[in-house]
A protein has these predicted regions:
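Conserved catalytic core of sirtuin-type NAD+-dependent deacylases
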Residues: 1-129
Length: 129
């Protein structure tokens, strides 16, 4: 197994060298990669939680009205996802996967933008909870 040089700086050049010498890298993504595609994240200013209060699990379980509201929010978000297109970040990740520099993408997103950018389904792991 080859030895990957250590990342000693935070420059794009250092990162590019690290990826170039890699054959087993994994990329982790979250909401930030999809904001350029028009999908808001949850915690930043202007994000979902700045516009509405999060629903807590115990409230969801205890109150049918809150469950209804939770599902309404989910369906409203799905409408926004339907029109979203992959952006340059998604395409850059897809290029790394397809050039065999990255083996898998682990994402907290369930927007399918990694798959729509060309990352095969079996190389995307969606972890959201």
């Amino acid at each position: 197994m080859g030895k990957t040089p250590p990342l000693t700086g935070s420059s794009n050049t250092e990162f590019a060298k690290l990826i170039f010498h890699s054959s087993r890298a994994v990329i982790f993504t979250g909401a930030g990669i999809s904001t350029e595609s028009g999908i808001p994240d949850f915690r930043s200013p202007g994000g979902v939680w700045s516009k509405m209060k999060p629903i807590q699990f115990q409230d969801f379980v205890a109150d049918p009205k809150i469950r209804h509201e939770s599902w309404r929010r989910k369906f409203d978000r799905l409408d926004g996802l339907a029109n979203a297109l992959p952006n340059s970040g998604h395409f850059a990740v897809a290029k790394l996967v397809n050039n065999k520099k990255v083996s898998h993408v682990i994402t907290q997103n369930v927007d399918n933008l990694h798959q729509n950018s060309g990352v095969p389904d079996n190389q995307v792991i969606e972890l959201h909870g």
